[in-house]
Amino acid sequence: HEIAQALDVTVSWFFQEGTQAKPGEAGLIVRKSTRKKFDFHGTGVHEEMLSPSLSGQILLIESTFAPGTGTGDRGRKRQGEEAGLVLSGVLELHLEGEKFILQEGDSFALPREGSHRCFNSSSEPAVVLWISTPAAY
């Protein structure tokens, strides 16, 4: 996020392109093989964009946190509303000084203001579906 801010671009600008969408699917359907991917090298965090574009109001991202990895100590600030669903594994969610342990199937909604941190303290990868609005990444 800091690099994107320094370059005055969104983080999505750095996403690697997946393969080309089939005719008639562009902007509507995202096949697993066509997802835009972002690997935070050396951090153990990998993200895939599930939304067909950033031109809408909602953004879907799938984040995979390797064991012992997270978003860092500083936390991430939100630009709007954000919620998530733990698809697999265990995730520590830190909000305003409180720690919540979330397991597969648990969901959460983050307050509009403030910041949050995530950490995977388990021995298995944690996969989280993030939903945010507006669609800014």
Task: State where each predicted segment sits.
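A short glycine-rich, His/Asp/Glu-containing loop-to-beta-strand
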Residues: 32-74, 130-132, 136
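Charged, helix-prone or intrinsically disordered regulatory segments positioned adjacent to compact structured domains
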Residues: 9, 18-45
